[in-house]
Regions:
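A short catalytic or substrate-binding loop motif that flags glycine-/basic-rich loops and adjacent residues
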Residues: 13-16, 134, 143-147
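Metallo-beta-lactamase
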Residues: 31, 37-39, 43, 51, 88-144, 148-234
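Active-site metal-binding motif and surrounding structural segment of the metallo-beta-lactamase
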Residues: 39-85
C-alpha cells in the first residue's frame, strides 16, 4: 500500500491495475473501498491493514460490477456499503457477476460476494456524508454513469472515482447488464455527462487534489485531476459525433468518424469503445 494523502492509502492489484483504497481515521478505524482482485491480494490487504494496527470498520463498493464487490473473511464481518440502486442491480444479475469473478479470480467466498448494506437515501447528483462505522469526513456522490447506483467517495482531498476518470479506460457507458441493451438506461451519454459535472462540483467544493480511478494511475495535483475531466469530456464528444455518422460515411463530410484517444490503443478498451459506438448508433437509428 502507498499513501496518497493523509489517511488515504492505495493498493493496486495485478489485474487491470485495479485500485483498492483504504481510508484510516486517527483511531485506526479503516474504510476499505473496492477490495480486489484475487483472493490472495484481498487477504494480503487484510494482513497489511492488521500489520499497521488498523481495524477494518466498514467497506464501500463504488458500483455493482463483480470486481468491485469482492471481500474476504480476513477483512472482518463489517457493513459493506453501496447504494440501494447498486444493490438492486447486482441482485438482478448476481449469477453472471459471480461467474465472471470465478473465471477471472477463482477462489473467492460465494457467501461474501456482493453481500452489501444499503446506504441511506442519497439522491442522484447530491453528496451525502457516510455515517459511522465509516471514518469521519467521508462523503459520497451518487450518479448514473457507467453502472446503476455508482458512487464516488470524497475524503481528505481525494476523489475515489470508481470506474471513471481513468488514464487507461475511456468512459464506459452503462449499456445494460452484460450488454443487454433492453435494460440499458434511456440516456447513458447524458447520465455520464451529468455525473462528470457532479464530480467536478465535488472536486471544487472539497478542494480535491488527488484522484484515484478504479483502474489506472492515480492523478496527483489539481491540473492532473482537471485533465482527467477534460479527456473524458473530449472522448464523449467525439463518441457522440462518430455515432451520428453512418459507419461507412460520406466523402467530404467534415465531422470526424474516428475517435482520437490514446486510451483506445489497448485492445480491450478498443473493443468496449466499438460496442458502445454501435449501441449509440442503434439508439439513433431505432435498431
Ligand atoms: Zn465497472
Amino acid at each position: 500500500m502507498r499513501q496518497v494523502a493523509a489517511g488515504v492509502w492505495v493498493a493496486t492489484a495485478e489485474i487491470w491495475t485495479s485500485n483498492t483504497v483504504v481510508v484510516v481515521d486517527d483511531d485506526g478505524a479503516a474504510l476499505v473501498v473496492d477490495p480486489g482482485i484475487t483472493p490472495t491480494e484481498v487477504d494480503g490487504l487484510a494482513a497489511a491493514v492488521a500489520a499497521r494496527g488498523w481495524r477494518v470498520a466498514a467497506g464501500l463498493a463504488t458500483h455493482p460490477h463483480w470486481d468491485h464487490v469482492l471481500w474476504s473473511a480476513a477483512l472482518g464481518d463489517v457493513p459493506r456499503f453501496a447504494t440501494p440502486t447498486a444493490i438492486a442491480a447486482l441482485a438482478g444479475d448476481v449469477e453472471r457477476g459471480w461467474q465472471e469473478a470465478s473465471s477471472a479470480a477463482p477462489g473467492h467466498d460465494r457467501a461474501l460476494f456482493g453481500a452489501l448494506t444499503p446506504l441511506g437515501s442519497a439522491p442522484v447528483g447530491a453528496d451525502v456524508p457516510l455515517v459511522p462505522p465509516a471514518p469521519r469526513g467521508c462523503r459520497v456522490v451518487v450518479h448514473e454513469a457507467h453502472a446503476p447506483g455508482h458512487l464516488a467517495l470524497v475524503t481528505r482531498g481525494v476523489l475515489v472515482a470508481g470506474d471513471m476518470l481513468s488514464d487507461q479506460e475511456v468512459p464506459l457507458l452503462d449499456v445494460g447488464p452484460g450488454g443487454d441493451r433492453a435494460r440499458a438506461p434511456l440516456d447513458p451519454l447524458g447520465g455520464y455527462r451529468r455525473a462528470l459535472a457532479a464530480l467536478e462540483d465535488a472536486v471544487a467544493r472539497y478542494d480535491v487534489a488527488v484522484l484515484v480511478p478504479g483502474h489506472g494511475a492515480v492523478a496527483v495535483g489539481r491540473d492532473a485531476v482537471a485533465a482527467r475531466f477534460t479527456a473524458d469530456r473530449a472522448y464523449l464528444h467525439a463518441l457522440e459525433q462518430a455515432a451520428a455518422q453512418p459507419p461507412s460515411g460520406h466523402a467530404g463530410c467534415d465531422v470526424p468518424r474516428t475517435v482520437p484517444d490514446e486510451r483506445l490503443a489497448d485492445r480491450w478498451v478498443a473493443g468496449e469503445h466499438a460496442a458502445q459506438l454501435d449501441f449509440l448508433r442503434a439508439r439513433l437509428t431505432g435498431r
